[in-house]
């Protein structure tokens, strides 16, 4: 057939497509099936800070959904040409921290192995400060404070127990908070985690008598229904880099703060973000 031939009625065309085209990508390349929809807070050649929406899991879980935050990040970097799995045998872009499916906010991703090692160590050494905004039921007796307790994780129930006295298998938790406002039976609270345990904010504030609005696991469904929320009003809205040791290739981040500029539930509450 000549290249300038025009198809005519009755012509038959045969296409030869490799079988691999119809195969499901292997799990390590599942990101190829995902369309990235990222809200990027900050990005450079080493790290990526993404504002994860509530409802999106950070990693693959028992639901086996391919659409995870890390898959979206890998897909995004693949499309940019910054991640080429066929050339990279030992490293794939990875998350440095994680938050619950129904918690929104900043998650840090490393673009290279050296960044991942440094970030993991900085997080372990508490040289990276993460602050949260949340809505909690009730009026706090103090405008600010530091609460200490003990937390034990139940792997079977996938929830935690908090107690004021030591628990067998429990770990110490320390939660700092500042009340930013109160109205209609709800407080807007900024929380800093001195320790970072599973469900710490949700379980600790509930233990103090102030469950998060929308939290079905540690709150009351009747209250959540009246509030009109189906997931907890909790956002990891700010990250501060406060290095006390050498930051290596990430030293330029020392002293910098990144935050989500618009948290819907806080804005609807009436909080003025220009104050921050």
Language-model segments: residues:
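Short, surface-exposed secondary-structure edge patches
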Residues: 2-6, 190, 231
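A short beta-turn/loop motif at secondary-structure boundaries
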Residues: 98-101, 169, 181-183
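Intrinsic-disorder/low-complexity, polar/charged segments enriched in Ser/Thr/Lys/Arg/Asp/Glu/Gln
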Residues: 129-133, 146, 172-174, 186-188, ...
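A structural micro-motif recognizing beta-strand termini
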Residues: 137, 191-194
């Amino acid at each position: 057939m000549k290249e300038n031939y025009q198809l005519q009625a009755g012509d038959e065309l045969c296409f030869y497509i490799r079988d691999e085209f119809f195969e499901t990508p292997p799990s390590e390349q599942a990101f190829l099936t995902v369309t990235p929809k990222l809200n990027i807070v900050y990005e450079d050649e080493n790290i990526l800070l993404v504002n994860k929406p509530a409802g999106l899991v950070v990693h693959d879980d028992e639901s086996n959904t391919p659409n995870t935050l890390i898959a979206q990040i890998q897909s995004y970097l693949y499309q940019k040409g910054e991640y080429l799995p066929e050339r990279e045998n030992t490293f794939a872009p990875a998350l440095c921290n994680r938050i619950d499916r129904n918690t929104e906010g900043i998650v840090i991703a490393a673009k290279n192995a050296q960044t991942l090692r440094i970030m993991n160590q900085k997080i372990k050494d508490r040289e990276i400060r993460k602050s949260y905004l949340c809505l909690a039921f009730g009026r706090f007796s103090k405008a600010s404070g530091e609460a200490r307790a003990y937390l034990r994780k139940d792997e079977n129930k996938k929830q935690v127990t908090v107690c004021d006295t030591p628990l067998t298998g429990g770990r110490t938790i320390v939660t700092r908070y500042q009340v930013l406002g109160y109205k209609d039976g709800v407080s807007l609270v900024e929380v800093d985690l001195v320790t970072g345990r599973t469900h710490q904010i949700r379980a600790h504030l509930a233990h103090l008598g102030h469950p998060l609005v929308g939290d079905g696991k540690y709150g009351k469904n009747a209250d959540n229904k009246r509030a009109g929320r189906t997931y907890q009003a909790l956002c990891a809205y700010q990250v501060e880099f406060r290095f006390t040791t050498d930051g290596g290739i990430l030293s330029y981040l020392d002293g910098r703060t990144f935050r989500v500029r618009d948290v819907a539930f806080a804005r609807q509450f009436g909080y003025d973000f220009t104050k921050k």
